[in-house]
Amino acid sequence: MITNRQQSILNAIVEDYVDYGLPVGSKTVIERHQVNVSPATIRNEMKILEGMGLIEKAHASSGRSPSIKGFRYYVDQLLENTSPRTEFNNQRLNKLLADYNYNLSNALSVYANELSMSTKYTTLIMKPNQSKDLITDVHLFNTVAHLVIMVIVFESGNVEHLQLAVPEKISKNRLVQIANYIKSIFNADMRNDFSDETFMHSNDYLIVNQLIDLLNQRLNDITTDIFFGGKANLIDTLNEQNVNSIQQILQYLESNKILKLFEDDNHSGIDVKIGQEIDNGLEDISIILSDYHIDNHLKGHVAVIGPTAMRYQNVIQLLYKV
């Protein structure tokens, strides 16, 4: 446990190092943070923090920089002193959904880029698990090219479109019957209105099963959709000394290992993984994890990826609004 003054000095060193990328000396701490003690006292406290492994002495400078342990301590205190969220309704995301006619993929793609622009870091958004999103309506439409378009409406407002080639045009009445039957398969409230034998001996049996298979396949696919914003920011925020980390983190993201990071994360709010807490070879990387909600019942995941010298406070405050 460190004293309040030592915590203030550690905070000053972390925040200055993040902002300027240079080791921080005692004089800088006093001038920039109005610490009302002598430089000698600051230097003594720095030696204590260094002895605890929270800061490190630069070889060619009298200043200190945060260690990985120091970043971890700083972040833990930051999270501990941040009030938990009580509101989960994301107004910006809801507006994007409305703007893009409730196409969740388009809305999340734009949202990932917006978050990246706000944080100045790379942002990743994972689509919600829509297997928990109730299907409220299904519509089928003919097209001129012997295609049937299936429009699926979810309780969250998301809309998905699928298409199936058919040998002949299907009448509107039959399309309505098929759509209602498919809806009953995926909506427990309607299951008593139809029996499994409704289309068992019908000419439409094959089409019905193909549409159901398409929908099941789509529901399985959309649970792992990932959207990136600002991938180039990784290169901008990692300096020449971290070139190896750029390659490592890109390989990590492309391998979808981050999905396991979300799965292993037991925090209900915001969590921060630093360096090897993420994976071997990522000592210079930090990932801030959070959830986002649609209509308070559908939950997805968001991650902000950057260097260990990240503006944690700014990103955490922004993610608390997600």
Swiss-Prot record:
Keywords: Repressor, Stress response, Transcription, Transcription regulation. One of its GO terms (biological process) is negative regulation of DNA-templated transcription. Pfam families: HrcA, HrcA_DNA-bdg. InterPro entries: GAF-like_dom_sf, HrcA, HrcA_C, WH-like_DNA-bd_sf, WH_DNA-bd_sf, WHTH_HrcA_DNA-bd, WHTH_transcript_rep_HrcA_IDD. It comes from the Bacteria. One of its GO terms (molecular function) is DNA binding. Disulfide bonds: none annotated. Negative regulator of class I heat shock genes (grpE-dnaK-dnaJ and groELS operons). Prevents heat-shock induction of these operons. Belongs to the HrcA family. This is Heat-inducible transcription repressor HrcA. The lineage of its organism: Bacteria, Bacillati, Bacillota, Bacilli, Bacillales.
